[in-house]
Amino acid sequence: HRGEYLYVAEGRGGFRVYDIANIANKSISERIVRAPFSPLGHNAHVGSKQATCFAIGTTQPVHPPKNTRFMQEVNQEQSMHPLFSYAFVTDAEEGLIVVNINTFGDGDPLNNFLERALTWNENGLLDGARFISLYGSFAYIVADQGLITLNIDNPLRPVVTSVIQLAGMRSFATQFRYLFYTSETGLGVVDITDPSQPILVKDSAVALADARKLYLARTYAYVAAGEDGLAIINIEKPEAPVLDQMFDGEGQLKDTSDIVIGTTNASLFGYVADGDFGFKLLQLTSPSSQPNFYGYSPQPKPEVIGWMPSKSRVLS
């Protein structure tokens, strides 16, 4: 999300922006709305054939047009890159859709209308596009052909700088000089020291039967591994990752699709989307389970401490 708005890729429903200004307001009955008033004066939707993912440059409620020359000279602010004005949406059939989202940062409630600024799929390169993340002024996209690198220094004129053929690639996350990806064969590593020319790291694979999404936290990669639960992989040496442990909570994790890591006080927690089996909460470190919990990157000692069923499949 950015500011008071939640951005969503809704598959056949396209790309939509929800108003979540009242998400913590107990006096409001409907806290997530498509429009705070009549949709005749607010249309935060861009239709597409199969929107799969999106990326924005920051979650801060920035408004680049306010970054004027006066602000740069008198207040000594840096100029803002043009990519901060856009949302980059992947669509499995249409490729890349670029949408200007500045309207949600200008403070004017009368002009909240979205439209495409660009639709791009040169020679079908982005057919099957299903995941995107920004790394500086580059966009890394997962598509049927593998990992596609686009230079988006000019967001409305993307330039292909690299294509790495990776069969069955699903998702990825970046940390410093490396990109860790999941595919139908497990976890792999790509060197992105030169962001424009990623290089596949040979002999870096960790075999997993059903690696889905992943999250990186210091020296560990947490990989959602479907019916096998959670794979925790040591990435202290990023070009030689090693499986640390598999965890399914004695059969409680049965359809693990995604995980996000967070810290509360001195304990590490994992928030797990467990597919057909709802939401699961893991405690990864605590004073009782891991005596070294105050260390920089203690070995996780996962345990399921909470869960919530869902009427539909929880994917992320």
Where are these regions (language model features)?
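Feature marking well-ordered beta-strand scaffolds used for ligand recognition
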Residues: 1-316
